[in-house]
């Protein structure tokens, strides 16, 4: 298991995706040193890490995101687990009260900064609704295609930070795509609260990866 650091805001998309893919290529390039089977790679993360994991898995056929070093290695993965991660930046405010939707309808919202980068001086930036193509390109839902690896999606039905609708949309899109996908909704769980650190939840994720990555 490897924990990966990646660039976040003020660095704009696709910086974090390029970092995630380069980390995979680095590990594969050093597979013998680390005792890794580079034909059996899984990615997982929660929140922003879940978003990044989904982006890595859904863009496997898009070499434009493979930048930097170790380009003779593939950044493809064989399994993906996303835990309460965003999947569609265009609808990220769905399922929230009006006051929360007002925050997302802002040039300073985190998802707008991810797509636009930090703005300076007279540049006001853009609402995501003004740049739907860019928002779609920075969303896992914008990259669904045949041949994706198996997915495990997990979300709490009491999440106050990332709406469960985000995982609903991803699950529906993957099902329509014919992708093997499992969707687990954790009752009463909020965003990253103690529900997620229960041993049965941890065991569930470990067993899922074991079942999908064992030879």
Question: Where do the model's predicted regions map?
Answer:
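Alpha/beta-hydrolase superfamily serine-hydrolase fold, recognizing
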Residues: 1-215
């Amino acid at each position: 298991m490897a924990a990966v650091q990646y660039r976040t805001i003020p660095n704009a998309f696709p910086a974090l995706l390029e970092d995630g893919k380069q980390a995979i290529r680095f590990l594969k390039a050093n597979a013998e040193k680390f005792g890794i089977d580079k034909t059996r790679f899984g990615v997982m993360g929660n929140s922003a890490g879940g978003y990044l994991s989904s982006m890595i898995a859904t863009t496997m056929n898009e070499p434009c995101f493979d930048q930097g070093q170790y380009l003779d290695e593939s950044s493809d993965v064989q399994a993906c687990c996303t835990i309460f991660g965003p999947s569609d930046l265009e609808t990220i405010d769905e399922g929230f009260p009006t006051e929360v939707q007002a925050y997302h309808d802002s040039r300073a919202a985190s998802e707008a900064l991810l797509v636009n980068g930090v703005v300076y001086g007279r540049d006001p930036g853009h609402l995501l609704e003004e740049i739907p193509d860019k928002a779609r390109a920075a969303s896992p839902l914008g990259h669904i295609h045949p041949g994706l690896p198996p997915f495990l999606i997990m979300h709490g039905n009491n999440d106050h930070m990332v709406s469960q609708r985000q995982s609903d949309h991803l699950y529906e899109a993957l099902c329509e795509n014919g992708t093997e996908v499992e969707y687990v909704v954790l009752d009463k769980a909020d965003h990253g609260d103690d529900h997620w650190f229960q041993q049965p939840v941890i065991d569930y994720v470990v067993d899922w990866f074991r079942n999908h990555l064992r030879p």
